[in-house]
């Protein structure tokens, strides 16, 4: 029974090896996306074949054929119109679909990745396109906590939280959910459940419209390895909009994320 699985895996490795032999691009971000995407392709292939072996019929879908993006590698921006059309044309609501998170493709069909927490974002993308009833994301924590349990003692599970509160927490650095994941769900008011795969019967955290932070506790976020960049003009004049635009263009060019401006 192992032979078909190994054959599929071998073909993926051969595909990757063929790309590496002909690749001439010096762009690290481009090369990164072409290579790391194979982790998702390999793992979903194994799951797909395992379920087939157990008699559970399912459709293996290459997310690169449906999630369409620009060519901003390692943090690609979604083409929502093309993506929705491709998903609706490829996914049957009556089938179990096994697909990848984190990856897509650009207009030239080169692989792209969606950045930090891109797999969760992929789930939200498919949910948005398919008008899903809800989305459940399985994590190694009980749900959304009011602080990082590796830093703070006696952290509290947030049972219910609104989209706005979850986006605010995520924006300021809470790592369980990424703001990009929440935005498409909020637009269609699709509830999000964050649950623990270590305790699958526990309810975890529910994120939905109109839910207030429950219980009412303060939330703490710690960011490590931050860099403070202080800018001033040589002629002591104010930094105005044109200067700020130039600064952010450079930061964007070098894929540097700004956490706070003062």
Stretch-by-stretch model annotation:
Residues 103-104, 119, 142-143, 199-200, ...:
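Short, glycine-/Ser/Thr-/acidic-enriched flexible segments
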Residues 4-5, 177-180, 191-200, 254-262:
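Flexible, glycine/charged-enriched surface loops at secondary-structure junctions
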Residues 54, 188, 254:
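Conserved dinucleotide-binding and phosphotransfer motif residues
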Residues 204-262:
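A conserved regulatory-domain signal marking ACT and ACT-like small-molecule sensing domains
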Residues 1-177, 182:
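Nucleotide/pyrophosphate-binding catalytic subdomain
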Residues 61, 99-101, 138, 195-197, ...:
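Generic beta-strand/beta-sheet core signal
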